[in-house]
């Protein structure tokens, strides 16, 4: 929370999953140590529990708790890596972001840890002055479900959010094939469950919970 002069509340909310939060990492490096090397060596140790592809937030400097806060705050920034790659870096933080983006994707971890070219969609970074003897570094991942909302309250009434247009999502067409078993969850029986075999393709309908 930052208190500034004015008569409005500017609010950013992130509904963050526990899987990615559990993979948060912190280290106190020596001043001569490489931030890039530490992050690249650390990401594989996170496994797939943070649900890649997602974002990495990197916080550098300050105190240990400040570095963690910087990493979390950086995840609130919009995804703009493609724009950054097109125009090129203009400062050391943008250079760091690009290098980490390329090297982490080069690890080949991929979606859900199953291998692939894309492990991170973007890398965010913020820094802060720190003691010359220290280099606190934090990295916090954000999963592929990046649920953010930003709104302003000015006293005129509650915030109103328009639901997204379903036309923004592409239509998915695929062939079901003859071997698909249609399962109605509303009338599912134990005998039907016992008839399933490993490798069966199930097409579910009805209420699951």
Identify the role of each PLM range.
Residues 171-175, 190-192, 208:
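A glycine- and small/hydrophobic-rich beta-loop-beta segment
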Residues 193-196, 202:
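Short, well-ordered loop/turn sites that connect or cap secondary structure elements
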């Amino acid at each position: 929370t930052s208190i500034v002069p004015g008569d409005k509340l500017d609010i950013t909310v992130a509904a963050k999953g526990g899987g990615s939060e559990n993979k948060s990492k912190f280290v106190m490096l020596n001043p001569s140590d490489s931030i890039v090397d530490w992050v690249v060596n650390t990401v594989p140790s996170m496994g797939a529990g943070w649900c890649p592809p997602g974002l990495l937030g990197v916080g550098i400097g300050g105190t240990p708790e400040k570095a963690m806060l910087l990493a979390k705050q950086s995840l609130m920034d919009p995804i703009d890596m493609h724009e950054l790659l097109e125009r090129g870096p203009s400062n050391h933080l943008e250079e760091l972001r690009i290098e980490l983006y390329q090297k982490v994707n080069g690890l080949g971890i991929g979606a859900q840890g199953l291998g692939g070219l894309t492990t991170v969609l973007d890398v965010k970074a913020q820094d802060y002055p720190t003691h010359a003897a220290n280099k606190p570094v934090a990295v916090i991942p954000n999963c592929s479900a990046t649920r953010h909302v930003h709104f302003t309250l000015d006293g005129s009434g509650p915030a109103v959010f328009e639901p997204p247009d379903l036309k923004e999502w592409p239509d998915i067409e695929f062939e079901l094939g003859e071997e698909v078993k249609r399962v109605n969850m509303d009338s599912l029986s134990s005998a039907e469950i016992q008839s399933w075999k490993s490798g069966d393709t199930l097409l579910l309908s009805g209420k699951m919970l």
